[in-house]
Structures are given as structure tokens and as C-alpha cells.
């Protein structure tokens, strides 16, 4: 009987590890094959990750769009400022031109007014001179010839004519005349062009000697007359 019990115990003990192995295998199988709850949680996590990725993409798109809008605004503002600067410059240039044109017009008007005033003054002076009573023809005819004044000589007439303005042609003709003038005191003869330009005459040696002799004689006589040596 004791042997039979020991065999049963050995069998039970031999069987017990197999049962424990079965339990372990069941635990392993349960751990290897997840349940429906675990599957649902993993799917929810995946969906959450996808949503977060979409949100990140949307944020990035918004940031890029905001950057683009800000850059476009800055470019538009810079273009508007540049256009406004160009407009102000053009306006200033046009104002300057208008101011210059107005100044020119004012100067022209002032010149015209001055010319008119000068013409009016000349007319008034002429009118006053014409209005003054002058000697009539009858008075001139009745006056004696002795009171008419001294008779003008040729030199005085020439001086009066010289005081009158001459044209360029008359001046050139007068200055082109060459004449030989003799000094009455010394007896020297000179070639004078125009009003007093002395010209040199080219002569031979013999003629030059004769001219010098005559000049020295004339100079000596003139000196004696001035000093009173000759009477």
C-alpha cells in the first residue's frame, strides 16, 4: 500500500510540472496575442499622431503664408514709398519750373514797364520843349546883323564838325588820308596820317643828309628867334 501511494504521488508530481507548463503557455499565448482593448488603444494613438502631424503641417502652412503676406506687404509698402518719393520729387521739380517761369514773366513785365515809363518821359520832355515859346521868324529878321554874333572861322567849323558823331566809314576815310605837313618855325616836313600819326619816309642817303642839314638850320633859327638873338 505504501508503494502504491508513493507511485501516485510521483505521478502527481510528474504531472504537476506539465500543468504548470500549460499555465505558462497559456500566459505566453495571452501575452503574444493582444486583446481587443490593446488594439483599440494602439489605433487611437495612431490617429492622434496623424492629427498632430496634420496640425503641425497646418501650422507650418500658416506660418509660411503669414511670412509671404508680410513680405508682400513690405514689398508693397516699399514700392508705395518709392512711388510716393518719386511723386514728391516730380511735384517739387514742377514747382521749381513754375517758380522760374513766374520769375521770368515778372522780369519781362518789369522791363516792359520801365521801357514804357522811359518812353513817356521822353515824350513829355519833347512836349515841354515844343511848348516853350521860341523866337519867331519876324524877330530874327528884324534883329540887326551885328547882333548875330561873331562869324565862325574854318577852324571853328571843323571843330564843330569834329564834335559831331561820325560813322565808321567816315572815320576810316579820314584816317586813311596821308598829307605832308611843314613846320613853319623849323622848316621840317613830316608825313602825317589821319589825325596825327607820324610816318617815316624812306629816302636815299643824300636826301637824308639834306633833310638833316635843313632841320638843323631851321632848329637853330627857331632857337635864336625864341631867345631874341635875332631881331
Curated annotation (Swiss-Prot):
Keywords: mRNA processing, mRNA splicing, Nucleus. Residues 1-12, 51-62, 91-120 have a biased composition (Basic residues). Residues 1-155 are annotated as: Disordered. The keyword Nucleus applies. GO terms for biological process: mRNA processing; RNA splicing. Residues 63-85 have a biased composition (Low complexity). Belongs to the ARL6IP4 family. May be involved in modulating alternative pre-mRNA splicing. This is ADP-ribosylation factor-like protein 6-interacting protein 4. The gene is ARL6IP4.
Amino acid at each position: 500500500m505504501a508503494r502504491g501511494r508513493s507511485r501516485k504521488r510521483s505521478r502527481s508530481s510528474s504531472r504537476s510540472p506539465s500543468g504548470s507548463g500549460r499555465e505558462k503557455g497559456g500566459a505566453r499565448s495571452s501575452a503574444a496575442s493582444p486583446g481587443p482593448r490593446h488594439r483599440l488603444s494602439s489605433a487611437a494613438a495612431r490617429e492622434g499622431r496623424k492629427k498632430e502631424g496634420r496640425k503641425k503641417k497646418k501650422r507650418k502652412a500658416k506660418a509660411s503664408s503669414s511670412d509671404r503676406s508680410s513680405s508682400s506687404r513690405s514689398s508693397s509698402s516699399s514700392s508705395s514709398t518709392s512711388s510716393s518719393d518719386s511723386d514728391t520729387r516730380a511735384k517739387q521739380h514742377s514747382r521749381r519750373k513754375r517758380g522760374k517761369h513766374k520769375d521770368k514773366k515778372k522780369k519781362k513785365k518789369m522791363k516792359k514797364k520801365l521801357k514804357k515809363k522811359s518812353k513817356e518821359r521822353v515824350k513829355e520832355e519833347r512836349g515841354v520843349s515844343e511848348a516853350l515859346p521860341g523866337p519867331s521868324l519876324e524877330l530874327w529878321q528884324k534883329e540887326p546883323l551885328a547882333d548875330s554874333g561873331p562869324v565862325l572861322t574854318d577852324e571853328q567849323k571843323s571843330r564843330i564838325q569834329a564834335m559831331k558823331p561820325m560813322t565808321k566809314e567816315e572815320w576810316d576815310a579820314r584816317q586813311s588820308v596821308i598829307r605832308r605837313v611843314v613846320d613853319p618855325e623849323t622848316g621840317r616836313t613830316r608825313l602825317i596820317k589821319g589825325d596825327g600819326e607820324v610816318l617815316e619816309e624812306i629816302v636815299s642817303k643824300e636826301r637824308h643828309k639834306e633833310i638833316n642839314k635843313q632841320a638843323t638850320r631851321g632848329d637853330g633859327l627857331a632857337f635864336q628867334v625864341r631867345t631874341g638873338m635875332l631881331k
